[in-house]
Design a protein with these regions (language model features):
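Auxiliary Fe-S-binding modules of radical SAM enzymes
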Residues: 1-46, 218-378
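Conserved Radical SAM active-site core
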Residues: 50-181, 190-191
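Hydrophobic faces of well-ordered beta-strands that scaffold small-molecule active sites
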Residues: 78, 130, 158-160, 181-183, ...
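Short glycine-enriched, charge-decorated loop/helix-capping segments at active-site entrances
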Residues: 96-107, 195-200, 277-284
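Conserved radical SAM core fold
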Residues: 98-99, 139, 164-167, 185-203, ...
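Alpha-helix-loop-beta-strand connector modules within alpha/beta enzyme cores
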Residues: 146-155, 209-213, 289-293
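Non-cysteine beta-strand/loop elements that form the S-adenosyl-L-methionine
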Residues: 175-190, 260-269
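Anionic-ligand binding region
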Residues: 194-198, 203-224
Length: 378
C-alpha cells in the first residue's frame, strides 16, 4: 500500500495550493469566510463579528499533549491557537484569547512568521501534526501559511480543530489541504446555540460542515503507532441540563453519516468565563447525565473513538496568561488525573487507551503501510 502523504504536498507541487490561497484571500475584501458573512474589507483591516483584520492573530504555539491519543501521540500535537473567534460561547475555556479582542491585537503576525512557527513545531519540537485551533475566521491566512511552509519542508498532517461554525463554501476550498478534521458538534437546537454562543443558525451550518468534512476525508485512519493520518473525528462536549442535545446530535451522526464515525465524547465541562452566573450552566455535569450519553452511544452502536472519564473536568484547563505553555502541566500528571474507569454496559470493544489515560479508546482503522509521516515522527 502506498504511504499516506499529506494532501497539501501534491497541491503545493502543482501550484493549486497557491491558487487556493489567492482565491481565499480575495474573499477577505468582502468577508464571507465564515457563516457570519460580515462583508467587511479585511484586506483593509476592517473588522466584523470576529474583530479580526488581515493579519492572523496567533495567541499560542505549543506542543499539546492533552488532545485525543491519535492526535497528541507521545510528543504532542503542534498546536497553533488563533486568537478571537466567530462564536461567543459563554462557557469558553479559551475565553482569555477568544473574547479579548483589544489584547489579542498585539498577537498579530504575518503568514511567513506563522509558517516559520509551523516548521518549528515540526522540526524542533518534533510534533506529530500541525493543529490549528479555532481557524474558521482565519482560513485564508492558514492556507497562505501552509503554502509558505510546504516548499520549506513541512510534511506532517494538518488538523483543522474547529468549533464547527464553518462556511460550506470555505470548506470546499480546503478539500485536499486538510488531512484531519476535528470539529465540534456543540448543539442540536438553534435557540440554545443563539442563547449561549450567539450563533442562531449553528445547527444547519454545523451539520452541513461536518457532512462536507466527512465527504473529503472519510473515516479516521491511523498509522502503526496509532497516530492519525487522515479522517474525521467529531467532538461532542456534554453540557449540563441537556443543553448540548447529546442524544439528538449522536443520532444525527449515526443516521446521516455512519455509526462508524470516530467520536470524542468529552465530559470535561466546568463553568468557565461567564457560565458560573448562568443557572443552567453553573455546574459540572452529573453522573446521570454522563451515563445517559454513554447509554446513547451503546444504543447506536457507535464504537469508534474515545470517551472521556467524568473526572476530567477537574484539571488541565488552559491559562493563556501564564508565561510559556498555556497547559504547563506535567504529562504524567495529565495521564493520572484524566484516568478513566471501565463502564459497565458500554460496547465490549471499548478499552482503556494506552496513549492517554483520560480517554477510553474504541476501534480505529489502522493503515498498515507505515506512512512516511508516522515513520518520521518516531
Amino acid at each position: 500500500m502506498t504511504a499516506i502523504e499529506p494532501g497539501y504536498i501534491p497541491l503545493s507541487r502543482s501550484g493549486e495550493l497557491e491558487r487556493r490561497a489567492e482565491a481565499l484571500e480575495a474573499r477577505l475584501a468582502s468577508c464571507d469566510i465564515c457563516p457570519r458573512n460580515c462583508k467587511v474589507n479585511r484586506l483593509h483591516n476592517e473588522t466584523g463579528f470576529c474583530h479580526s483584520g488581515f493579519l492572523p492573530i496567533v495567541s499560542s504555539v505549543c506542543a499539546h499533549r492533552g488532545e485525543e491519543p491519535a492526535i497528541s501521540g507521545q510528543r504532542g500535537s503542534g498546536t497553533v491557537f488563533f486568537g478571537n473567534c466567530n462564536m461567543r460561547c459563554v462557557y469558553c475555556q479559551n475565553y482569555q484569547i477568544s473574547q479579548s479582542w483589544r489584547e489579542q491585537k498585539s498577537n498579530e503576525i504575518d503568514c511567513k512568521a506563522l509558517a516559520a512557527n509551523m516548521l518549528y513545531l515540526q522540526d524542533d519540537l518534533k510534533c506529530h501534526n500541525i493543529n490549528f485551533v479555532s481557524p474558521s475566521h482565519f482560513v485564508p491566512q492558514m492556507v497562505r501559511a501552509i503554502a509558505e511552509a510546504a516548499p520549506m519542508g513541512l510534511h506532517i498532517p494538518i488538523v483543522y480543530n474547529t468549533g464547527g461554525y464553518d462556511s460550506l463554501d470555505t470548506l470546499k476550498q480546503l478539500d485536499g489541504i486538510i488531512d484531519i478534521y476535528l470539529p465540534d458538534i456543540r448543539y442540536a437546537d438553534n435557540k440554545t446555540a443563539r442563547k449561549y454562543s450567539q450563533a442562531p443558525d449553528y445547527v444547519v451550518h454545523n451539520r452541513a460542515a461536518i457532512k462536507e468534512m466527512y465527504r473529503q476525508v472519510g473515516d479516521l485512519v491511523v498509522d502503526k503507532n496509532g497516530l492519525a493520518q487522515r479522517g474525521l473525528i467529531v467532538r461532542h462536549l456534554i453540557l449540563p441540563n441537556g443543553l448540548a442535545g447529546s442524544e439528538e446530535s449522536l443520532e444525527w451522526i449515526s443516521g446521516e453519516l455512519s455509526p462508524a464515525v470516530t467520536m470524542s465524547v468529552m465530559s470535561q465541562y466546568s463553568p468557565q468565563h461567564r457560565a458560573h452566573k448562568i443557572p443552567l450552566l453553573s455546574r459540572k455535569i452529573s453522573v446521570a447525565e454522563y451515563e445517559g450519553v454513554v447509554g446513547v452511544l451503546f444504543r447506536l452502536s457507535m464504537e469508534n473513538g474515545w470517551l472521556q472519564e467524568l473526572s476530567s473536568s477537574d484539571t488541565y484547563l488552559p491559562d493563556f496568561e501564564r508565561e510559556g505553555h498555556p497547559f504547563d502541566t506535567d504529562p504524567k500528571e495529565v495521564q493520572e488525573t484524566l484516568s478513566c474507569r471501565e463502564f459497565e454496559g458500554v460496547p465490549h470493544s471499548i478499552k482503556k487507551s494506552p496513549k492517554n489515560g483520560g480517554l477510553r479508546g474504541l476501534n480505529i482503522t489502522e493503515d498498515k503501510s507505515s506512512p512516511q509521516t508516522g515513520e518520521r515522527a518516531q
